[in-house]
Regions:
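Non-catalytic N-terminal regions of enzymes
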Residues: 1-229
Length: 229
């Protein structure tokens, strides 16, 4: 097993060293979401490890290229409000697994998969302060296949964002020039709010069309009753 920090191929501009979370990010659960991607061997020769090693080296190189556009992913969560990036890079682990892809996929079982593909990524603190936004572990299977395990913070990386990142990484690994590029403008569109203050209750008058009158009256009553309690 080996561990390294993969840095963006180009240094991050000084003005981008801190990324402020948006209101939408604040509302997301502070949890890391795991994902496993399986890749079958190119050929049936399980001893062709030179080719596997070449692919792994290309994965690291292309990840470095991809992080140039996705620079917040290589940072750490600070105070639950910011992503601090200081060129430390993203945690990247390589491990060997003594099982084949067919053994894992023949009878899919999450517990078995977790045992055969142990995660050596850092333990996550409940507060997520100082925790890497994203961590990656690449497992070399004995058949020549590869299993890539990712753990990404749901505060900044939701499903569509994760898909965009993986597409960009794959495009870079293929040497394709059509890699998607993010813009990270959410903090401008949805500025942060102080969520520690209690929500103020206001009477809300609902006017519904296409519904029976008793439903509209009931909802108006519940709204006024809620605002008075």
């Amino acid at each position: 097993m080996s561990e390294a920090s993969i840095k963006p191929s180009c240094p991050t501009p000084h003005h981008s060293r801190t990324y402020k979370l948006s209101l939408l990010d604040q509302l997301m659960p502070s949890a890391h979401v795991p994902m496993i991607l399986f890749y079958r061997p190119i050929n049936c020769d399980s001893n062709n490890m030179n080719l596997v090693n070449e692919r792994l080296e290309r994965l690291k190189q292309s990840l470095s290229e991809t992080l140039t556009s996705f620079y917040p992913f290589a940072g750490k969560i600070k105070d639950g409000l910011y992503i601090d990036y200081n060129d430390s890079g993203i945690q990247y682990v390589e491990a060997k697994v003594s099982c084949s892809l067919s053994e894992i996929l023949c009878k899919p079982d999450s517990q078995m998969t977790g045992n055969k593909l142990p995660s050596n990524l850092s333990r996550l603190d409940s507060s997520n302060v100082g925790i890497p936004v994203a961590m990656i572990q690449v497992n070399k299977l004995k058949c020549g296949g590869i299993a890539i395990v990712t753990q990404t913070s749901h505060e900044i990386i939701d499903g569509p964002t994760s898909t965009t990142f993986l597409k960009a990484w794959a495009a870079s690994a293929r040497g394709s020039g059509d890699a998607p590029r993010p813009n990270f403008i959410a903090p401008l569109l949805f500025p942060q709010k102080n969520l520690s203050n209690p929500l103020l209750r206001h009477p809300i008058i609902l006017e519904l069309t296409g519904f029976p009158s008793w439903i509209s009256s009931f909802l108006q009553f519940m709204s006024l009753w809620s605002s008075s309690t």
